[in-house]
Structures are given as C-alpha cells and as structure tokens.
UniProtKB/Swiss-Prot annotation:
Superkingdom, natural source: Bacteria
Function: Peptide chain release factor 1 directs the termination of translation in response to the peptide chain termination codons UAG and UAA.
Entry GO terms, CC: cytoplasm
Record GO terms (molecular function): translation release factor activity, codon specific
PROSITE patterns noted in UniProt: RF_PROK_I
Annotated positions of the N5-methylglutamine modification: 235
Family as reported in the entry's similarity comment: Belongs to the prokaryotic/mitochondrial release factor family.
Subcellular location, record wording: Cytoplasm
Modification comment: Methylated by PrmC. Methylation increases the termination efficiency of RF1.
The name this protein goes by in its record: Peptide chain release factor 1
C-alpha cells in the first residue's frame, strides 16, 4: 500500500489550526462566514488524518509487542487479532483520505440549471418528464435546497414537453451532475387499453449556474430578437414584445424565454441559461476527450447516452453506467432513494480518479 503524502497532510493540519486561531481573534462578519465554511469543509479530512495517525501509532505499539520475545502466547494471540483490526481500519482511513484529497470540481458547490425534455413516446414521454421533475424537486427538498421553475411547456395530457428550473443549494451540482443523459421508462400508460408496456424517454441536462466571469460572451457574438409571447395555440398572449430569443453565433446555441411579462427579466433568464449552456458545451467536449482516454463509464459528458431505465412492472431502476439495479422504484421516484444511485455513481467516479493517479480503489 503506497504511502500518504505526509508533508501535504502536515500543511493541511497547520492551515486548519491557523483558521481555528483566526476565529478566536477579531474578524468581520463576511470573514467569519468564509472561515467557518472552510473549516466545515476541512473538518472531515482533518478528523480522518488524526484518526489515521492514531491508528498508525497504535500499530507501532502492537508490532513492538509482537517483536518482543518475552511476550507470552496468550498476549501474542490478542495482539495479532488487534493488529488485524487496526490494519483494516488503517486501510479504510487511507482510502477516505485519498478520496478527500482528490481535485475538486470548481463547479461542485454551484447552483444548477436543470433541463428536462420529453423524448420518444409522445404524451407518455411528457408525463415521464413530469415524473422526473417531481423526483428531483422532492430530492432537492430533502437536501434543503430550493427549486424555481424558469420556463415550462406543458404536455397535452400533463407533464412537460420541456421544463427548465434553477436548483439552489450548496453542493447542488456535485450531487446532480451525473444525472445528465437519457432516462427511459417502461410502463403501461393510463391510456393503454390492451395492458401493453410502452417504452418512452426523456433527456435530462444538469448545468452548473455560470457567472459572467466564467464565460466570456462578446456582444458581437449575440443575435437578440424580441417578439410578442405566444400561447399554446400560437396566439399572442400580450401586446408588448416581452419574449426574447438570443442566439450565440459562434456555437449556434439558441435560448428563447417568454415566461415573464417583463422583457428585462426574460432577457436576464435567457442570458443565465445561455452562459450555462456555452460552458457546458465546452465541458462536454473536454469530458468526452478525457473519458475516451480513461474509458470512464461515469461523467463521459455524452447527453445521448441512455443512462437509466425505470421499469414500473418490475419495480426496478437500473443505472446502465455502473450496472446497478435497485428494486426501489417508488422510493427513487419519490426522491427518497435517489441518493443511493447518486452515491454509487460518485463512488465509481472517485474510483476512476484514484485509478488515474495510480491508486487502487
């Protein structure tokens, strides 16, 4: 088992102690918030490092006892059993520390733009898109996050042809980023009289909320059109040109927003979505190149990839990237067991990162 970077851990512990000392002095409100937030992020790693070093010292004591020729057989047997337990605990702590030291995605703490679109399957696909949105909405509530619908186009029988929402909460992108891709549902629709199982699909895109400083958008690269907002039948629903369509000419990305009566609000919402999509398009390109080199199953950035199947007759959910099946479909759709899938995907991604660094997961 390769060693941990002890010098790096010493620096980490010293920095943690320095932050704690700063809190004992006089600090402003904003600085207090920054320090306490950094401490809360460092605390799990610091505790693991301290526990690892305690176990390492205990192992040294046990080894000394085993090497002592005067140790009797009964004491030796007890020491060997203790050594096995300490060795296993040390291995767990080393893995925990290595994972904690992995490079963090700069966007992990950001809010999320969640986009869900009905795919193949007509009305049933729209209903499924609605089910997915409610699943994420309930999951967000369990995390203490908030969800605000930015734009929605309802299906003729319910659900959504398309819905865009902002998920606000610390670590939202870290939790939801592996949800992007094609989600497939297999079930008997309410309108099906023969009892046949239909297969439908919806596409989910999870984009980090991007700030102006993250993406350089030149005014000359934008084509902005204004128009009167239209209802479902194509009729104009107000007399002012409040609807906005923004085209980013270099990438061809188009965002249209008409949900607000305020052109200013529609424009701001459209620009937020545009920034996220431009950033995401570049990240997809980089992720695809990276995953092709590493043959990663998770985080490939391929939005056309079928990632998960929800089979209602069998009550199961299967994530195809990691071959994980849970017979907890009602709990997953209710947002309660979705975390189990997300945690498994995160673990797989971390294992790939560790393998890339030359460590066994």
């Amino acid at each position: 088992m390769s060693k941990l970077p002890e010098a790096k851990l010493d620096v980490l512990l010293a920095h943690h102690a320095s932050l704690e000392a700063q809190l004992l002095g006089e600090v402003g409100a904003s600085e207090y918030v920054r320090i306490t937030r950094e401490l809360s992020e460092l605390n799990p790693l610091v505790e693991a490092v301290k526990a690892y070093r305690e176990v390492r010292d205990e192992l040294g004591d046990v080894d000394a006892l085993l090497e002592d020729p005067d140790t009797d057989s009964e004491m030796r047997a007890m020491a060997e059993a203790e050594r096995d337990a300490l060795d296993a605990h040390r291995a767990e702590l080393i893995q925990e520390i290595r994972v904690a030291l992995l490079p963090k995605d700069a966007m992990d703490e950001r809010n999320v733009m969640l986009e869900i679109r009905a795919g193949t399957g007509g009305d049933e696909a729209s209903l499924f898109a609605g089910d997915l949105f409610r699943m994420y909405e309930k999951f967000a509530a369990l995390q203490g996050w908030s969800v605000e619908v930015i734009s929605a186009s309802e299906g003729s029988m319910g659900g959504f042809k398309e819905i865009i929402a902002e998920v606000k909460g610390r670590g939202a992108f870290a939790k939801l980023k592996f949800e992007s891709g094609v989600h497939r549902v297999q079930r008997v629709p309410d309108t099906e009289t023969q009892g046949r199982i239909h297969t439908s699909a919806a596409t989910v895109a999870v984009l980090p909320e991007v700030e102006e400083v993250d993406v350089d958008i030149k005014a000359d690269d934008l084509k902005i059109d204004t128009m009167r907002a239209q209802g479902a039948g194509g009729q104009h629903v107000n007399k002012t040109e409040s609807a906005i369509r923004i085209t980013h000419l270099p990438t061809g990305i188009v965002v249209m927003m008409q949900d607000s009566r305020s052109q200013h609000k529609n424009r701001a919402s459209a620009m937020n979505i545009l920034r996220s999509r431009i950033y995401d398009a570049e990240q997809q390109r980089l992720d695809a190149a990276r995953s092709a080199e590493r043959k990663e199953k998770v985080g490939s950035g391929d939005r056309s990839e079928r990632i998960r199947t929800y089979n209602f007759p069998q009550g199961r959910v299967t994530d195809h990237r990691i071959n994980l099946t849970l017979y907890k479909l009602p709990q997953v759709i209710a947002g309660e067991a979705l975390g189990e899938l997300i945690d498994a995907l995160t673990t797989e991604h971390q294992a790939a990162q560790l393998a890339a660094q030359g460590h066994a997961a």
